[in-house]
């Protein structure tokens, strides 16, 4: 009778089954990655003064700025609004990816995408 080469995994451990499950999970992750890359998230800051649209690949698709917040005497405020909006958009994409990965894998994989 052959000994189990992986103690602690029980006698019913099947490396082929594990490889099959790993391939299936990899396929599901790749499919999810493509789907997430197509999704877009819109975020605003300053009460809607600045809006950013970002996709799942963290590519900025558009930035909209209300004309009334463009003040040549106060460029710093506009810069702060844009930075805050872009950073929030990135955080939302990261959260979306993590939540969707948990659905597929049963656990999060930070920084996967």
Swiss-Prot record:
Protein name: Nucleoid-associated protein Athe_1143
Keyword hit for Cytoplasm: yes
Molecular function terms from GO: DNA binding
Subunit structure: Homodimer.
One Gene Ontology cellular component: cytosol
Chief subcellular location: cytoplasm
Function as written in the Swiss-Prot or TrEMBL entry: Binds to DNA and alters its conformation. May be involved in regulation of gene expression, nucleoid organization and DNA protection.
Subcellular localization: Cytoplasm, Nucleoid
Species for this entry: Caldicellulosiruptor bescii (strain ATCC BAA-1888 / DSM 6725 / KCTC 15123 / Z-1320) (Anaerocellum thermophilum)
Disulfide-bond pairs as recorded: none
InterPro entries, A to Z: YbaB-like_sf, YbaB/EbfC
Sorted UniProt keywords: Cytoplasm, DNA-binding
């Amino acid at each position: 009778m052959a000994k189990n080469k992986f103690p602690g995994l029980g006698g019913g451990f099947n490396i082929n089954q594990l490889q099959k499950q790993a391939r299936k999970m990899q396929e599901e992750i790749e499919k999810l990655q493509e789907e997430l890359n197509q999704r877009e998230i819109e975020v605003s800051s300053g009460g809607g003064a600045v809006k950013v649209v970002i996709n799942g690949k963290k590519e900025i698709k558009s930035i909209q700025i209300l004309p009334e917040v463009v003040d040549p005497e106060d460029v710093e405020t506009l810069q702060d609004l844009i930075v805050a909006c872009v950073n929030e958009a990135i955080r939302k994409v990261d959260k979306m990816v993590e939540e969707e990965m948990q659905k597929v894998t049963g656990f999060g994989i930070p920084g996967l995408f």
